[in-house]
UniProtKB/Swiss-Prot annotation:
Function recorded in the entry: Required for the insertion and/or proper folding and/or complex formation of integral membrane proteins into the membrane. Involved in integration of membrane proteins that insert both dependently and independently of the Sec translocase complex, as well as at least some lipoproteins. Aids folding of multispanning membrane proteins.
Transmembrane region(s): 3-23, 376-396, 450-470, 502-522, 534-554, 558-578
Main location per the UniProt record: membrane
Gene: yidC
Presence of the UniProt keyword Mitochondrion in the record: no
Source organism of this protein record: Porphyromonas gingivalis (strain ATCC BAA-308 / W83)
Stated name of the protein: Membrane protein insertase YidC
Length: 627
């Protein structure tokens, strides 16, 4: 080859290279051509499938190829994932055992290893057919495909983790990665994808999610357990709220973003936490048949941020476990206030001051006592003594006031004898003279109510605490097998109208003892504080009526709560009796007589009362003049 030939070939090569370089397509054109090719192939596949399906219908045959075409017509690129064999994948640690299914790639069963049902059976939060988790996939060709209908392949499997893979083809897939935390009730779930540009729309930024669960009955009293069963949810960076636990059916549509949603019963919960947020939330619950094996049917649907085309991931955390207050609070340690999960609000402790008492006084005290005592009967006794000791200084003032009223009773009876009439004028004079006596002696007629008023917030706080604390669940004391439920010493199966509905088909002994002790408390305190006024006679039956109502109301409640109220009443009576020995009534009477000779400044309350009496007397006289 001569020199000129070589030069010519080089020049030709340079010309060809230069022409190719100058006329090369830009990256956008290449991507557009690739998408066009994919779309053309997809449309061609659809056309072929429809043609085969039409031919099969015409010929009356259904060969495998026609079934595949029909599957493609419904599921598109995911048609291949509709065929497969369902397989169970087990994950476990020391606290829970989970079963996941390759069909849908979701959790099918949750067993809590440390807990039993009321009748001693293994405690499952749900089993096969009782829970459903679904990601409706909206594809680029406007199909809506449910992951519950598709088969996933388990990869990277260990005893505590697995990746469920939904394959589109060899290079395109959707992954659900599960990791069970060691010695914990939490399960991490990550949703991610690879090369899914051909599956999802170009403008996709949110993914749909559906979750449902039939909440199983775990405790002895269906009615009482159902009262604490509901859907709870937390607004992103805000407070925790819930659906009504008393309505037969309830539902809400929430546009505000949510951080988590929970299906909870009295002592256990299933919680789904989104690391980002849920939007377009729809929550619904419906109460199951009374006395059945289920409490409520709960469902949620929402959307969450996800763009799998760009390789982003959506992270979630499932919590399947007991509602132990201190454990749930510990999940927020080290977090910023706005990032707190506030899962401790799943334990209902009341509102305002009652929650404050439980959170900062009762729970720390009971936690401390559990370090030294294992018997909850003893712990409740010590809690009761502690509360009584805490309010004893102020309660003493109440007992002192009751003693004053008791010592002044003969003088009040003299006033009643002086103005015996039942007409309005006599009643006004009698009331005015009695108030003047109390004011002169330095006694307050309402001060005797102070002990009850002081312990009232604690009584309400305990009413919120005992039925919801899992610490007393299946803890026995004396004849009570479970302090979190009623202690039936006698029961029957026949349905007695009204009685069975409002009282139940059993007799709770601690409830009965509570009622008896409350009657003793009422009789003793009313006898000590009775002033002899007619108004007292009119009101003396009210506490007894209330006690009978409580007998019906608490018969199906936690026996631990009734035991606390029983102790509280007995200790209060003992305090009253002890005050008779502590307070020197002779010295107190001398002090009252001395007070009568001293000039006393009227209290604002007494001044207003006397002013009201004067106005009432003036109106009465005007009415008499008109007559």
């Amino acid at each position: 080859m001569d020199k000129n030939t070589v030069i010519g070939l080089v020049l030709i090569g340079l010309v060809i290279f230069g022409f190719s370089w100058l006329n090369r397509p830009d990256p956008q054109e290449i991507e557009a051509q690739r998408k066009a090719a994919i779309e053309a192939a997809r449309q061609d596949s659809i056309a072929k499938a429809e043609a085969e399906l039409l031919a099969a219908r015409t010929q009356g045959a259904t060969p495998d190829s026609i079934k595949q075409a029909a599957g493609y017509n419904q599921y598109g690129l995911l048609a291949a994932a509709t065929a497969g064999a369902e397989e169970q994948v087990e994950l476990a640690n020391g606290k829970i055992a989970l079963k996941l299914s390759t069909k849908g790639g979701a959790i099918r069963e949750v067993l809590l290893r440390d807990y039993k049902t009321h009748d001693g059976k293994p405690l499952y939060l749900f089993r096969e057919g009782e829970s459903d988790f679904n990601l409706p996939l909206r594809t680029v060709d406007n199909r809506l495909v449910d992951t519950r209908d598709l088969y996933f392949s388990p990869i990277s499997r260990t005893d505590s983790s697995v990746v469920m893979r939904l394959a589109v083809d060899s290079a395109s897939y959707l992954d659900l990665a599960y990791v069970l935390l060691p010695d914990d009730y939490r399960l991490r779930m990550t949703v991610s994808g690879q090369n899914l540009q051909s599956l999802f729309p170009a403008n996709m930024t949110m993914q749909d999610l559906e979750w449902s669960q039939r909440i199983r009955r775990q405790e002895k009293s269906w009615k009482f357990e159902n009262q604490y069963t509901s859907i709870y949810y937390k607004y992103s960076g805000d407070e925790v709220d819930r659906l009504s636990d008393s309505k037969q059916e309830d539902k809400k549509t929430l546009e505000e973003p949510l951080h988590w949603v929970s299906f909870k019963d009295k002592y256990f919960a299933s919680v789904l936490v989104c690391d980002s947020y849920f939007e377009n939330n729809k929550l619904a619950q419906k109460t199951a048949a009374a006395g059945s094996d289920y409490l409520k049917n709960c469902t949620m649907s929402a959307t969450f941020p996800l763009d799998v085309r760009s390789g982003t991931k959506a992270r979630f955390t499932f919590f399947f476990g007991p509602l132990k207050y201190n454990m749930l609070r510990a999940y927020d340690k080290g977090m910023k206030a706005e990032d707190n999960l506030d899962l401790d609000h799943l334990v209902y402790l009341g509102a305002s001051i009652f929650r404050w008492i439980n959170r900062y006084m009762i729970i720390p005290a009971s936690t401390f006592l559990q370090q030294y005592f294992s018997n909850w009967g003893l712990i409740i006794l010590l809690l009761t003594l502690g509360i009584k000791l805490l309010i004893s200084p102020l309660a003493y003032k109440g007992y002192l006031s009751s003693a004053k009223m008791r010592l002044l009773r003969p003088q009040v009876q003299e006033i009643n004898a002086k103005y015996p009439g039942k007409d309005q004028e006599s009643m006004m004079k009698r009331q005015s003279a009695t108030m003047n006596l109390y004011r002169a002696a330095g006694a307050g007629p309402m001060s005797g109510c102070l002990p009850m008023l002081l312990q009232f917030p604690f009584l309400i706080a305990m009413y919120m605490y005992f039925p919801t604390t899992i610490d007393i669940r299946q803890q026995s004391f004396l004849w009570a097998e479970d302090l979190s439920s009623y202690d039936a010493v006698f029961s029957w199966t026949a349905d007695i109208p009204l009685l069975s509905q409002f009282y139940g088909n059993h007799v709770s002994l601690f409830c009965l003892l509570m009622s008896i002790s409350n009657i003793l408390y009422i009789r003793y305190t009313m006898n000590q504080s009775d002033t002899g006024q007619e108004g007292m006679a009119m009101l003396k039956w009210m506490p007894y009526i209330t006690t009978v109502m409580f007998l019906f109301f608490f018969n199906q409640n936690a026996s631990g709560l009734c035991y606390y109220y029983f102790l509280s009443s007995i200790i209060t009576v003992i305090q009253y009796m002890s005050s008779r020995f502590i307070i020197n009534e002779e010295k107190l009477m001398a002090k009252l007589e001395a007070n009568k000779t001293k000039p006393r400044k009227k209290s604002k309350w007494m001044a207003r009362l006397e002013e009201a009496q004067r106005q009432q007397e003036a109106m009465r006289r005007q009415q008499q003049k008109r007559k």
